[in-house]
Design a protein with these regions (language model features):
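Compositional signal for N-terminal targeting/processing segments
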Residues: 2, 20-22
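Bacterial N-terminal signal peptides that target proteins for export
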Residues: 1-12
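N-terminal soluble domains immediately following signal/targeting peptides that reside
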Residues: 22-171
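N-terminal signal peptide c-region/cleavage motif recognized by signal peptidases
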Residues: 16-17
Length: 171
């Protein structure tokens, strides 16, 4: 290939805009149901696969991909990441451990759902939820958690600088 053609191709590649992401807004949505019978908070967290892979790779200091990384290795890294970025503390400050249930992929929607539980013997009222998942990778990340305890419902929204909220149901 002649030198001018190579230079033109290189200039075209460098001048081209970056590939568009599948979505322009970075969000996660969680459903957190308090199960009074088991005294656990049952959480289902939805993230976009590409967003999660990017944040997980930075956190793990190595490239991790849902398609290429062995499932056990990916899940172990995902558990560690979620335990660091999605936490719940009881009203007296005790950290509720994250108990892994599993994950599911919805390829058509580019969605990855994580399922985990957190023991909360005293209930969810007054607990502090800290949710900063993906925020270190995407400054405009918006995370929401829909908390339910029987008939009581509450939605918590977490922005870049607002990563902790207290569960307070209206009377």
């Amino acid at each position: 290939m002649n030198r001018w053609l190579r230079a033109a191709l290189l200039a075209g590649v460098l001048a081209a805009p970056p590939p568009l992401a599948a979505h322009a807004i970075h969000t996660s949505v969680a459903e957190a149901d308090y199960n009074a019978a088991t005294r656990r908070l049952e959480v289902s967290l939805r993230v976009f696969i590409d967003d999660f892979e990017a944040a997980l790779s930075v956190h793990a200091l190595r490239r991790l991909s849902l398609a290429a990384t062995p499932a056990a290795e990916f899940d172990a890294a995902a558990r560690a990441y979620l335990a660091a970025t999605f936490t719940v503390r009881t009203p007296d400050g005790q950290l509720a451990p994250l108990v892994w249930v599993g994950r599911e992929v919805r390829d058509a929607e580019n969605e990855l759902w994580f399922h985990f539980e957190m023991p909360l013997p005293g209930g969810v009222e007054g607990c502090r939820v800290h949710h900063r998942a993906l925020g270190e990778q995407f400054p405009t990340q918006i995370n929401s958690v829909r908390v339910r305890d029987g008939e009581r419902r509450l939605t918590l929204v977490f922005l870049a600088r607002q990563t902790e909220k207290t569960v307070r149901f209206r009377p």
